[in-house]
């Protein structure tokens, strides 16, 4: 037994050293420096070293002895900077070991690969010590980033996997969806930089079911010493639920980096195919280690993963995805075999052997090696192929779930995040801009883009067509358009967000008189200036929550501009009554079309189009409907206006209107419902009513309808009887009515059950509400607020409302006789009757 264990230790150490050497080979000096010094920086803690912070920061790695490179670094600090290095105290040190995991040291490591580092620590560290160690690791990440090396640290309690603890979707080890599978990946890819050897490798595969008992036997026999080994536990049996959750997580990752994740996704699919008796890849590698079969290029974990996936796809005769996964593997290795190299490294030798076995020709190699120059056609083809593969994996996963009657163990929150990200990335919806280049090609820019409009009645469907060439008849006719949409806004957004349209692109347009080149260039400049191409991926918190508009552009008069009719005409209007929504003698709306372009908190990009004189109303209702009442305000709201005339005025007015409506929408509360906004459009008045759950729009023909709508919204749901014809008014009201102003009369009911309202408009038309149970003060406040805002911001034609100050009265009895007094928040009995000389303004209280 002793000799067997010693032989295993020697094999382990040899393979570990091979992996360390491979990790450093062909990498730049910065990577080599970071990779070599990380153990030293974690073992020691000194102000002259990167990662230093005040406090009792845990330091010291068990069994650590500096190598030659690390000793040279320490000597330089002592010699040139006067640093006195003090070794941590003897005994069990807080850090059990430092390990890389993932593609590092495998054939899958490339010059752009990052480093995932597990810092395993003793379980006796308290929460403050763990926080300090985490902060130090964050500082070391920043130090590495300053050298151009991406490093991610993960603190791992040595008992984490024994206690079935899980991370969350915020990190690389993410999700309640992974536990044993995460340990499987660690065991097959880990490279020990410093600290204890990994105990799991010493337990034969046929003893896996009795892992703890076997380990205790080794300790009891004195074959192994407990404090020399990192023990994260055995690879117990896997549940179907864990496969399901882990596969969903891999699909989540594959959205942003499909070439990188497709191989892992298919490995999990292979595991599920073998369920309930899967052969975990880590166990396979360990078995070969114990048997002395150092195959697959030194038990390279990446090559062995490809080998297992190949075995699975061949067994189910899925040669389409097998070809795809081989291409993904080739691109991940990033060795361009079609180009001669003076030095043939081990990774190039491995890839050459595999490509020879696959029977690839030079043309295929050249095509793959030219990936950096792939343009939209190749990228879209690759995107569709990757999407098909991912959806096939998803369908197989669903079959697996049904076959095993799964009750998914992943937390509902995690599953919700995964599902929402899949939806945001892949769901095709009208107006949604599909992003086709998730790290497939670095540059999709086009030197020429042509937008062509086809009017109704032609052979081709009406709308806009986009071509990636200059408008040469021969070239246009002989090529399919890149994209089609009924509206120009969607095409410009698609070209911009997919990277085809850049500052260097020459633009051409055949707009059939609808849009000319200067207008197109202005729009492109506005969109590119206000919408950055790349944003951080949506956080799990954002995906937990309803999507919210983050960046919004309102594009006015792009495709239809009413002010174009002013050309060579004399237009009469009064600057004192200038209203862009109801302009001039004919009260024309100067907003003819509205396009919306917005990005939401899930990083979806959406477009919408509205046309005609009601386009502003429709666009407003749509924008506000997409903002739930508890949403955060958009980070930015921009108005792009492309009118030939009065551009600045229209843009300013639309900006004011949209900003005010957004504020009203997001500030409505349960305690203060019934806010409203009136808007005069083309001689007609519309009311926008802001309730907690929605925003409604109502056309208001006259003053009675208008104020009735306000009253209805304030008293909604109460017992209200309305009369409009043959109304018998109280004599005191009938005698008090006066044309030219709006009058509200409040009357207490005889049974003291609520109150009545009599509304007379400027023409003395009457509407009556009986037995109202709402608040008179709120009604007065809202009508007064409406008057104030309307007077400040709108100009209305004389045919609508004169907008003399609405008057509010209370009908009271004084000495047994009904009289009218001005309404106060607290009506005062026995107040002198109201002055009926309407040339003298009535005293009125405003509520703001």
UniProtKB/Swiss-Prot annotation:
Q: Where is this region: Regulatory?
A: 541-848
Q: Please summarize the record's notes on activators and inhibitors of this protein.
A: The regulatory domain is involved in the regulation of cyclase activity by the carbon source. Activated by the PTS system, glucose-specific IIA component (CRR).
What InterPro entries does UniProt report for this protein, alphabetically? Adenylate_cyclase_1, Adenylate_cyclase_1_CS, Adenylate_cyclase_1_N
GO MF annotation list: adenylate cyclase activity; ATP binding
Q: What is its EC number?
A: 4.6.1.1
The record's similarity note reads: Belongs to the adenylyl cyclase class-1 family.
Instruction: Give the function comment from the record.
Output: Catalyzes the formation of the second messenger cAMP from ATP. Its transcript is probably degraded by endoribonuclease LS (rnlA), decreasing cAMP levels and the negative regulator Crp-cAMP, which then induces its own transcription again.
Protein name stated in the entry = Adenylate cyclase
Specify the species.
Escherichia coli (strain K12)
């Amino acid at each position: 037994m002793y000799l067997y264990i010693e032989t295993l230790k020697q094999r382990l150490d040899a393979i570990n050293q091979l992996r360390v050497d491979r990790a450093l080979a062909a990498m730049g000096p910065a990577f080599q420096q970071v990779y070599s010094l990380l153990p030293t920086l974690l073992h020691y803690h000194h102000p002259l070293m990167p990662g230093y912070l005040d406090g009792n920061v845990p330091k010291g790695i068990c069994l650590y002895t500096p190598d030659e490179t690390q000793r040279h670094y320490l000597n330089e600090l002592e010699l040139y900077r006067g640093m006195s290095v003090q070794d941590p105290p003897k005994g069990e040190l807080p850090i059990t070991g430092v390990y890389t995991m993932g593609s590092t040291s495998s054939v899958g490591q490339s010059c752009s690969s990052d480093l995932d580092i597990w810092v395993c620590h003793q379980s006796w560290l308290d929460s403050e010590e763990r926080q300090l160690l985490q902060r130090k690791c964050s500082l070391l990440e920043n130090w590495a980033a300053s050298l151009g090396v991406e490093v991610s640290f993960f603190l791992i309690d040595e008992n984490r996997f024994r206690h079935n603890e899980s991370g969350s979707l915020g990190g690389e080890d993410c999700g309640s969806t992974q536990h044993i599978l995460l340990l499987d990946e660690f065991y097959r890819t880990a490279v020990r930089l410093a600290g204890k050897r990994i105990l799991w490798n010493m337990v034969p595969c046929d003893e896996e079911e009795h892992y703890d008992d076997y380990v205790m036997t080794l300790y009891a026999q004195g074959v192994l010493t407990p404090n020399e080994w990192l023990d994260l536990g055995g690879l117990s049996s896997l549940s179907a639920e864990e496969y399901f959750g882990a596969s969903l997580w891999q699909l989540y990752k594959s959205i942003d980096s499909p070439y990188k994740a497709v191989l892992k996704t298919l490995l999990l699919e292979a595991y599920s195919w073998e369920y309930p008796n899967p052969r975990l890849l880590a166990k396979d590698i360990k078995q070969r280690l114990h048997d002395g079969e150092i195959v697959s290029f030194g038990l390279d974990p990446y090559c062995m993963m490809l080998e297992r996936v190949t075995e699975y796809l061949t067994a189910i005769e899925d040669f389409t995805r097998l070809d795809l996964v081989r291409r993904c593997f080739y691109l991940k290795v990033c060795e361009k075999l079609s180009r001669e190299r003076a030095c043939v490294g081990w990774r190039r030798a491995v890839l050459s052997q595999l490509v020879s076995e696959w029977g690839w020709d030079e043309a295929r190699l050249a095509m793959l090696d030219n990936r950096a120059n792939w343009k939209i056609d190749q990228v879209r083809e690759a995107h569709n192929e990757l999407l098909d593969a991912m959806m096939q994996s998803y369908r197989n996963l669903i079959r697996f779930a049904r076959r095993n009657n799964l009750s998914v163990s992943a937390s509902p929150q995690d599953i919700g995040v995964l599902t929402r990200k899949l939806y945001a990335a892949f769901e095709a919806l009208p107006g949604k801009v599909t992003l086709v280049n998730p790290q497939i090609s670095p540059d999709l820019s086009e030197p020429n883009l042509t937008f062509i409009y086809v009017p109704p009645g032609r052979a081709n469907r009406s709308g806009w067509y986009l071509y990636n060439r200059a408008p040469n008849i021969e070239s246009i006719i002989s090529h399919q358009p890149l994209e089609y949409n009924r509206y120009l806004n969607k095409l410009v957004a698609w070209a911009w967000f997919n990277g085809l349209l850049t500052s260097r692109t020459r633009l051409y347009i055949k707009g059939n008189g609808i849009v000319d080149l200067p207008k197109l260039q202005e729009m492109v400049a506005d969109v590119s200036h206000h919408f950055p191409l790349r944003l951080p991926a949506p956080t799990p918190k954002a995906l937990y929550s309803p999507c919210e508009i983050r960046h919004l552009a309102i594009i006015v008069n792009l495709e239809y501009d009413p002010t174009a009719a002013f050309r060579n005409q004399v237009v009469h209007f009064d600057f004192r009554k200038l209203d862009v929504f109801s302009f001039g003698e004919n009260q024309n709306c100067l907003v003819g079309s509205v396009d919306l372009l917005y990005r939401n908190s899930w990083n979806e990009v959406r477009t919408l189009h509205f046309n005609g004189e009601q386009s502003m109303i429709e666009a407003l209702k749509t924008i506000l409907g997409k903002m739930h009442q508890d949403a955060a305000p958009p980070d930015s709201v921009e108005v792009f206006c492309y009118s030939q005339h009065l551009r600045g005025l229209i843009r300013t007015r639309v900006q004011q209107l949209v900003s005010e409506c957004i504020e009203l929408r997001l500030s409505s509360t349960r305690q203060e419902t019934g806010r409203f906004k009136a808007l005069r459009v083309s001689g007609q008045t519309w009311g926008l009513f802001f309730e907690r759950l929605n925003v409604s729009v109502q056309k208001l023909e006259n003053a009675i309808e208008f104020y009735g709508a306000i009253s209805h919204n304030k008293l909604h749901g109460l017992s209200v009887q309305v009369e409009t014809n043959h109304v018998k008014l109280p004599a005191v009201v009938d005698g008090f009515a006066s044309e030219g102003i709006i009058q509200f009369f409040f009357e207490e009911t005889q049974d003291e059950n609520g109150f009545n309202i009599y509304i007379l408009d400027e023409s003395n038309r009457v509407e009556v509400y009986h037995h109202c149970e709402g608040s008179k003060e709120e009604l007065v406040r809202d009508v007064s607020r409406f008057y104030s805002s309307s007077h400040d911001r709108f100009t209305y034609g004389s045919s609508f409302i004169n907008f003399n100050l609405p008057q509010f009265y209370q009908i009271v009895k004084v000495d047994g006789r009904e009289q009218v007094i001005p309404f106060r928040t607290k009506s005062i009995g026995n107040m002198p009757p109201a002055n009926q000389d309407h040339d003298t303004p009535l005293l009125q209280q405003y509520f703001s």
